[in-house]
Amino acid sequence: RVVALRDGSEARSYIPLSRESLRDRSQAGLAERFDGEFLRAAVRPRHARGAREVRVADLFAGCGVMSLGLWEACRAVSARMVPVLAVDSNEVALAVYRSNFAGALTIPSPIERLVDGDLGSPVTATERNLLSRIGRVDVLIGGPPCQGHSNLNNHTRRIDLKNALYARMARFAEIAQPTHVVIENVTAVRHDRGRVVD
C-alpha cells in the first residue's frame, strides 16, 4: 500500500499475500484484498524500525475495532501506534481488546466514573490519577453510544441519558489535550436535543 503524505513523500506498507490473492493479478478489488489479508493474518505486520510513536487512548473501546484501524493507519504512514488506555463498560469486549493490544491499560468501567469533571472545570482527583497512569496522549478515539442518536427504530431515545456520554469524550480531550480527536457516531447525532455536538 502506498500512502501519499502531506509533505509530498510516500509511505509504503506491505502485507504478505495468500496464494489465492497472488493468483488474482487484477487491480480491481486490490484494496479489499489487501485489507482482507490484513484482517485474516495470524500475525500482525511489523512497524518500520525507528517509527515515530503515536500514543492512543480509546474510550468506549469495545473489542478495539477503532484501535485496530488506527494501528494499521499508523503502520501505513511509518508510525507505531502505542495504545495507552482502553475504557469500556463491557468486560467481555475489553478482554478481546486486551488480547489484541496487550500493552494498554484497560479499565472495565463506565467512563463517567473515570472522567468525572464537568467541561471547563478544574481537573478532578480521579481524572488526575487516570492521566498520571497513562502519560501523554497523542490521539483520542472513541465511539460513544449511538442508539439514542440513530434514526432507525428510535421514537423515544432522543432524550436518553446515555446520549450525554458524548461529552465525556470532550472532557477527556480537554484534560488530556491530545493532538487529534476522532469520534465515531451516526450522522443524526447533530440533532440531539441536548446539543452534544455543539
PLM regions: where:
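Conserved active-site and SAM-binding loop architecture
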Residues: 8, 13-198
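N-terminal accessory interaction module
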Residues: 1-8
